[in-house]
Structure formats: C-alpha cells, structure tokens
Amino acid sequence: MWVSSPDPSDIQARVKALTEARGVPMLGENDVPPLLADAVVATEDERFYSHHGIDSIGLSRALLYDVTNLCLCQGGSTITAQLAKDVYLGGSDRGYNKVKDMALALKIERVLTKRQILADYLSEITTGYGHYGVTEAACVYFHAPLGSLTLGQYALLAGVTQAPSIYDPTVNPDAARQRRSQVLAQMVAEHYITAAQRDKANAEPVVAAGPGC
C-alpha cells in the first residue's frame, strides 16, 4: 500500500509508537552524542549532511556493483531511506519497496532536520538480539548511560547497528573489535577524529557487560 506524504507529527508519532511498544526511549535531536553521530554517519552515510534523502553517488556505485556482479548485493541506501523503510514499510528489503523508501526519504528530508532524522533512526534501529535503539544498547553492552561512553564504545555501537547478529560484542567480541577498528578508520578518513584518537580507542578492551542494566 502506498504511503501518503509524511509530515513531522506523522513520522514522530510513528517513531514514538515504535519505541513505546519496545519499551525504549525516543531520542530528541539534542540527545545523540556527537561522537556517536559522527561514527554512524561516517560508516553508514558519509554524505548524509549534503544529500536530500537520496545519495546519487552511493546509489550509482551500488547499482554498478550489482550489475557487474549480477546480484542485488548493495542497496545504496541512506540513513533517511532506512528510517523510512523501518517506520513506514516495516523494514522490508523487497526491491519494489526500495522505490518507496527513497520517495519517502525525499519527503522526510523536507520536514525534519538532519539531527532529528538521525535521532529517530538511532531510536528505532535493531541493536542486538531483541534490543532496539542505541540507548538500550549502551545499557545492555556497557551498563552505562548513552552520553557517558568512550569513543571506542561509540564506534562499537555504530558497528553493531549495521549487523547486530555478527557484531554483538556479547556473542562475537573478536568480530566486534574488528568492526570497531573499521568504524574508527572511517572516522579518520572522514576527518571526524585524529589518528591519535583512533589508536587510543582501538586500544580499549571490548568490554561487554552482557544482558541487563
């Protein structure tokens, strides 16, 4: 079913309903720690602050890869498109819905700030086995408030969100450490942190406290 044009109250109400149903907090645009925002943008959507919902460069690159490899391997999706897919389309990855989530992403970008889009996305994403949102992830993995984590912990969270079943530090600490290193390297490449900060964060142990807060 096609979705009508979203407006701020519509999408905010939907995200609120999702987070309330899952028992996790909904982040406001000022609640996302800057280092976490930098880590997520650097690794998931490097042109997030310059595109309008669709990253034409990333989409073209993904299309070329898929055509060359005869597969639907790369989606070229943006953070905004992912939010649209999760909130309006139930997270479906079917090709038919990719057109819808891109169209919705363009509309969402007209009515929400970049900071609120990122906050909504980080409020509702899957972050582990039955866990949702980065606030719960910080509690589950580190037994700490979201705003009090280290650079290494933020990088680990950013890595977990892309593939929770693979990078969950309570299940695969070695994979989580490797992914954290990749996130930190990308943050250096995008000029969010220095090489010295990267090295210090890479030296942090991957300490996962396990389920419960």
Identify the residue ranges that each predicted region occupies:
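Juxtamembrane regions of bacterial inner-membrane/periplasmic proteins
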Residues: 1-213
